[in-house]
Structures are given as structure tokens and as C-alpha cells.
């Protein structure tokens, strides 16, 4: 590539898409820089590390309490949250350090700050300009709270605050938004002993997920963790309120929250409010100066991740891509897009997008994992499909499992080719890998049904489902 540019490739954003792209590009011995305005690894990746670490701790605490009850032990189990918080912070710092080392290993320049396109070949960061032959935009998405009265003058939290910054958990919490982040946050708080209310403006939680998965997760949250879920409910105003004694028995500063459901209006007082709603693409970087087409859905790309400007590509959550499945996005998909974009930037055999083999995991207990198409995806695309649902209770594994709430939903087309699956189970993220491998290698239902499985393992459910679909 030409020496008249500072770099052969500038990547804007160091999330999953940006990091995978940087590694692929650096391995090709070209000059690469990443521009990042946050911590290395991007907020979404760092959030994921913090959330998984916190959930691991919450699960251990929750299971320990259940064990005491099972053994009729009357002891009260407590925790030292500052110590637990420090453990989470250590894991996050370890992750950030590993990302920084990877930059050094691949000889990637790291430029801190906000990038702004000046022209199709140049960006400004603070008072400096950087030019490149090619650009890859991986700026992700951010929370958009919209028009909520009092939002500017009232303290509130985002999910990342709960896992990464809050050193003392509130006792009564309202979580606004019942998507993946909202539900994971609500479950974590409830397992740590908080009273939790969840509001969702749609008529169901986890919109886009299979209805069977929603039913199991909802039952676990409501019956098991005593979380109150209010659907078709919109928060319209929040207000810092006076100190008062709340139902937890503590005298604290409260937040007055006004909600509407249809014509009915209701007010609640909580110790904290967490917003997990309305992600919007981060497109405020002068895209118009480079001639890049974008909308409120994100940057417009083709199926090779090329924007309206041939030398500029985009990948990850910032992309407005109609191919994405109804269960949203994942780090794995973003990383795949980043690598694919670099392949196409380097003019190799051009690759086109396909999400057939990718999975999305909801990190609750039990976990819900979706790979490929959902039933809703098939209906929206006019695909005739055959579906089988196998409850966990039909497996030998259920005889030794403490909970038997799970199931496998397997979907195939009229030619009995696997299209997708949803698994709800404690170890769903492990069990799904057989299906991912099978779809990737185009295994037939007969091959799945004939494959030797460990009889007492949950993964035997795949064999049972495949046999039932034949």
C-alpha cells in the first residue's frame, strides 16, 4: 500500500469487531492503528467480563443459600460486597491488561480519543490528523434514554454501572427494559438479595426470543426469584425524592418513578433505577464528511461489509444490517464481521456474510442459547419448517439434575436440513456446540441421531430431538 498515508488501515473502535480485525490485519504485515475513546476492549467487551464475573459470584451465593435450605441448616449466609466488588475489578483489569499486551504483540498503534472524519481518507483525533488507505468503523452502540422527564436531574444507573462501579448494592431496584441486558441485570440483583421490579414497554420480555424460552425464564424470575415484571409499561418520569423508610426497612434517598400502562398511571419509590433500553448506533463521527451513508439504524453496508465509500468498511453493532437474526447480536458475530471485513479490505477472495452458525446466549439460570434461525425468523422469511421440542425431563440426565426446567427446540427445513435451535438449560452454552458443529459441517439428522452420546449427559437431548425429527 502507498507510503503517502500514515497507515494502511485505521480501525475506529476496539470492541470485538475492532480487535479481531486488528489481529487479522496485523498478521498480514500492514501498518495498523486503532482509535479508541474508552478503555481498550470497548465498553461492551469489558461489560461482558464484569457481568459474567458478577453473575458467577451471584450464582455461588445463591446456590450456597439453597444448599443450606436443602440441609435444613438454620444459619444465615451473608456476604462482604466490597470484597466481591474488588474480585470483579481484578478480573476486568486482567482482561484490559491482556488486550493491551495483544496490541504490543501485533505491533498495533493505539490512539486514544474520539475520531472524526475530515475527508474520505483522513480523521482527526483531538488536534492531530491521521490518514489511511482504508478505514474500518467498529464504534458499536450506546444507550439512548429518549425523552424521560427528570432524567437530567436524577441519578440513575446503566447495567455496566451495577457490575463495574456500584460498591454497595441498593435493596430495592427498578430495572427499565427486559431485553438481554435488563434481564441479566435483574437476575443478578435478585440473587444478591435485592428486591427487583422490571418494566418493559412491549407485551413480552426478551422480544425476539422463542416463546418457550421466554416462558421458562419468566417462570424462574417470577416464581423462583420473586422479581415483579410489568409488561406494556413505560417509564415516563423520574424524580429525586425525599429520604424515607422504604420496604427494606432502611431510611434512604429514594427515586420516585412514574409509569404508564395504557391510560393507567402508577408511581413507585425505589432506591435505584437501572436503564437497559434503546441502544443506538454510534455514528457521530463525521461520516457525512467521508460520504458514508447511514441512518438511525446504523451504517449502511453490503453483504461484504463495504459502505457506500469503497475503501471504508464497517463491522459490529454500528452496522445497519438486515441479515441479523431476531435474537440480536453477540460478541462472536461482531468478531466474525471484523475478520471478514479485513479479508475483503485486503482484496482477498471476497467473502459474504452468513450468520447461520452463530449463537446468542442469555446468561441467566437456566441459560437460553439460540443458534441459527428461530421459529419467528422462519415465519418472517416464509420458510416452511419442521419443529420438535424435547423437554429435559425426557433425558436420563434429568434423573440426577436438581432442576429439570430445560428443553431443546430443533428446527429443520422440508429437506431435513438443520436451520436452528434453542436450548434452555444450565449448561446450554456447552450443549449447543454439537448443533453448531453439525450445522457448520452440514451433518444430517441421521448423523446426529446415530452419533454416540453420553447417556447421562444433557447433550443426549440432541440425539433424541434429531431422532424425533427424522
Give the predicted meaning of each segment.
Residues 2-7, 23-169, 202-206, 211-213, ...:
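Glycine-rich flavin
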Residues 139-195, 199-201, 229, 288-290, ...:
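Glycine-rich dinucleotide-binding loop and its adjacent helix/turn
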Residues 154-170, 267-344:
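FAD-site-proximal beta/loop scaffold in flavoenzymes
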Residues 213, 315-377, 455-470:
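A conserved FAD-binding loop/helix module that cradles the flavin
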Amino acid at each position: 500500500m502507498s507510503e503517502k498515508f500514515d497507515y494502511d488501515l485505521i480501525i475506529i473502535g476496539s470492541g470485538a469487531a475492532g480487535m479481531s480485525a486488528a489481529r487479522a490485519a496485523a498478521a498480514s504485515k500492514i501498518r495498523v492503528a486503532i482509535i479508541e475513546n474508552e478503555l481498550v476492549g470497548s465498553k461492551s467487551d469489558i461489560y461482558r467480563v464484569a457481568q459474567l464475573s458478577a453473575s458467577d459470584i451471584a450464582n455461588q451465593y445463591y446456590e450456597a443459600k439453597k444448599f443450606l435450605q436443602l440441609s435444613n441448616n438454620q444459619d444465615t449466609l451473608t456476604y462482604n460486597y466490597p470484597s466481591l466488588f474488588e474480585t470483579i475489578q481484578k478480573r476486568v483489569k486482567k482482561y484490559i491488561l491482556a488486550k493491551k499486551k495483544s496490541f504490543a504483540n501485533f505491533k498495533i498503534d493505539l490512539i486514544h480519543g474520539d475520531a472524526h472524519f475530515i475527508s474520505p481518507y483522513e480523521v482527526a483525533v483531538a488536534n492531530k490528523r491521521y490518514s489511511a488507505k482504508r478505514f474500518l468503523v467498529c464504534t458499536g452502540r450506546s444507550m439512548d434514554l429518549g425523552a424521560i422527564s427528570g432524567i437530567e436531574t436524577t441519578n440513575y444507573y446503566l447495567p455496566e454501572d451495577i457490575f463495574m462501579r456500584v460498591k454497595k448494592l441498593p435493596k430495592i431496584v427498578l430495572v427499565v427494559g427486559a431485553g438481554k441486558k435488563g434481564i441479566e441485570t435483574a437476575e443478578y440483583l435478585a440473587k444478591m438479595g435485592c428486591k427487583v421490579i422490571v418494566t418493559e414497554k412491549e407485551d413480552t420480555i426478551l422480544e425476539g426470543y422463542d416463546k418457550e424460552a421466554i416462558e421458562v425464564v419468566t417462570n424462574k424470575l417470577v416464581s423462583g426469584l420473586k422479581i415483579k415484571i410489568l409488561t406494556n409499561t413505560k417509564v415516563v418520569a423520574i424524580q429525586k425524592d425525599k429520604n424515607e423508610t422504604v420496604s427494606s426497612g432502611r431510611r434512604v434517598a429514594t427515586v420516585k418513578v412514574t409509569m404508564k400502562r395504557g391510560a393507567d398511571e402508577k408511581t413507585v419509590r425505589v432506591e435505584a433505577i437501572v436503564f437497559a433500553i434503546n441502544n443506538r448506533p454510534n455514528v457521530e463521527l463525521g461520516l457525512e464528511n467521508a460520504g458514508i451513508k447511514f441512518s438511525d439504524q446504523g451504517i449502511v453496508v453490503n453483504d461484504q461489509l463495504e459502505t457506500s465509500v469503497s475503501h471504508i468498511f464497517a463491522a459490529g453493532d454500528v452496522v445497519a444490517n438486515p441479515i441479523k437474526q431476531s435474537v440480536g447480536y453477540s460478541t462472536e458475530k461482531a468478531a466474525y464481521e471484523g475478520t471478514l471485513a479485513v479479508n475483503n479490505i485486503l482484496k482477498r477472495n471476497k467473502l459474504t456474510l452468513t450468520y447461520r452458525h452463530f449463537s446468542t446466549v442469555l446468561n441467566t439460570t437456566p441459560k437460553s442459547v439460540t443458534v441459527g434461525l428461530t421459529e419467528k425468523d422462519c415465519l418472517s422469511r416464509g420458510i416452511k419448517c419442521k419443529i420438535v421440542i424435547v423437554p429435559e425431563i425426557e433425558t436420563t440426565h434429568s434423573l440426577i439434575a436438581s432442576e429439570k426446567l430445560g428443553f431443546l427446540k430443533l428446527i429443520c427445513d422440508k429437506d431435513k436440513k438443520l436451520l436452528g435451535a434453542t436450548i434452555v438449560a444450565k449448561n446450554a452454552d456447552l450443549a449447543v456446540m454439537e448443533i453448531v458443529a453439525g450445522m457448520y459441517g452440514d451433518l444430517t439428522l441421521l448423523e446426529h441421531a446415530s452419533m454416540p452420546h453420553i447417556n447421562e449427559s444433557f447433550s443426549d437431548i440432541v440425539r433424541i430431538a434429531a431422532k424425533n425429527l427424522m
